Amino acid sequence: MTSDVAFPDRFTEIDELTRPDHYWLTDDDRCYFLGEYTAGRGYSYSQTNQLILNFKKSLDRQGKPEWQYKQSALLQAAASFRRALGKDPPAHVFVPMPPSKARGDPLHDDRMTRMLRAIWPGESADVRELIVQSESTDAVHEQPVRPTPEQIQAAYRIDTSLATPEPRIVSIVDDLLTTGAHFRAASSVLAAHFPAVQIIGLFLARRVPDAESLL
């Protein structure tokens, strides 16, 4: 598996300098990212922007000429994770962030699960859809006001059929870290069910403000 995306070979940890960009994160949250996605810019702005936007293509684009780029982005994302995490899966339970659409919804997009399973094909990586979206909601970028962690958590539940063996370390995996609200919601619902679990977040990219908008 190869990748032509200029991601670093290692994850970078969110620290005191970058945490203000993701204001729902707490000092105790351990989150790591590979690339930086520039808000308000399009596909051509950077390789990371191109990958994230292709990866996030809605299922209503299926069958269109551009659909091929979603699958290509998925494989590129998996290759980048493999390069950063190593050729053998660590002893974590990898939990994909649930999409905004519930299971059974025609627009339910399991891209994070498929990406995780593509990192170590044929290996024994522990990938579990532990967190389930109980009802479909609008994607965050389609909502006039960004939801709080509590509002997001209200639609989450644990799939208890996947809860054993109980995880010791959970990596919540998502494509883009924005405000941190989804990570906080996912962390809270996992910690309530597994009080002793250690939780980290792994992201393809973090959102950064457009430098020109700050001038």
Give the location of each predicted region.
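Active-site-facing substrate-recognition patch
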Residues: 4-90, 101-109, 131-166
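N-terminal cationic-hydrophobic initiation segments that often serve targeting/anchoring roles
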Residues: 82-86, 120, 191
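A structural signal for short coil/turn segments at secondary-structure junctions
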Residues: 88-89, 123, 194
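Anionic group-transfer/hydrolysis microenvironments
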Residues: 98
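Substrate-recognition/cap helix-loop segment adjacent to the acidic, metal-dependent catalytic center
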Residues: 107-125
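PRPP/pyrophosphate-binding module of the type I phosphoribosyltransferase fold
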Residues: 141-215
